Regions:
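N-terminal secretory/targeting leader peptides
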Residues: 3-120, 132-275
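A short acidic, glycine-rich active-site loop
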Residues: 120-127
Length: 275
């Protein structure tokens, strides 16, 4: 009888160990991401920081590698690449999708009254913003799962060859901006070119732009704005608040275990708190 008990225990132990062996053989889930930021931009550092949070919190069960803008696709091509599965995910801002669905820019360059960045994030999470964003993505057939984080303050008006002193100074001015601000400055008479961050300073250096705004003084300095312009005009109404976007290919996100999805959400909140 004792031999039968030992035999039964051995069979049970073997059965219990089978799933553990299968899990060990499957290994970690690896994801390749790209940001919309140049490698030297502090925003790419934020993208790397988010990936590290997820990698550490999952204990290596999910490993995210983040490449800088242009490594796989141009910065403005991130949404399509993630939707199609060319990339597993990405880090950027909703305003960069303006050409696909201009309402997406409401989260980043909306009217200069009402909500600041923290209020936008609160509305997005608790007031129906996330559901609206999902509907907008569905309207253009985008297969993505989006998370917003990281409140950012009002942006500078931009860098210019000479000071802007009146509205008329924008007439005929070759200017870089993005999102709904494209329509705003176009209506003011500017010739607007919506370039990604890494292309702005070279364009100003070649005289293709008379002025440009990107985001903040730290990023602008790292990208070389002071090398091509000595006039920086602070504060503006064109982009009073902005947030980052974390984006997954939805098919791949939906296939993740519930535990990893919870960690992704927690890492997003932690990254937002850091800012």
């Amino acid at each position: 009888r004792r031999r039968n008990l030992l035999k039964g225990a051995a069979i049970a132990a073997g059965a219990m160990s089978a799933p553990m062996i299968a899990k060990a053989q499957s290994g970690p889930i690896n994801m390749r991401w790209q940001s919309t930021w140049p490698a030297k931009d502090i925003f790419h550092e934020y993208a790397l920081d988010y990936a590290k949070k997820v990698n550490d919190m999952t204990g290596g069960d999910l490993k995210i590698e983040v490449l800088p803008a242009g490594s796989v696709v141009p910065a403005f091509g991130l949404l399509e690449a993630v939707s199609k599965g060319t990339l597993d995910g990405g880090h950027g801002v909703l305003g960069y999708h303006y050409g696909k669905q201009n309402a997406l820019a409401l989260w980043n360059s909306g009217p200069a009254f009402g909500m600041d960045a923290n209020m936008i994030l609160a509305w997005h999470k608790y007031g129906g913003g996330a559901e609206l964003l999902s509907k907008l993505y569905a309207s253009i057939g985008s297969n993505v799962q989006s998370f917003l984080y990281g409140p950012m303050a009002t942006q500078p008006l931009g860098w210019f060859k000479k000071p802007i002193t009146k509205t008329a100074d924008f007439k005929g001015l070759k200017f870089r901006t993005n999102g709904l601000a494209i329509d705003l400055f176009t209506a003011m008479g500017a010739a607007v070119n919506a370039l990604p961050g890494g292309e702005i300073v070279p364009a100003m250096d070649r005289g293709l732009l008379d002025g440009a705004e990107f985001n903040n003084a730290s990023s602008d300095r790292l990208l070389g704005f002071p090398d091509v312009s000595k006039v920086c005009m602070l504060q503006s109404y064109h982009q009073s608040a902005e947030t980052f976007e974390i984006m997954f290919n939805k098919t791949k996100y939906d296939a993740l275990p519930a535990k990893l999805k919870a960690i992704i959400a927690g890492a997003t909140e932690a990254a937002s708190a850091d800012m």
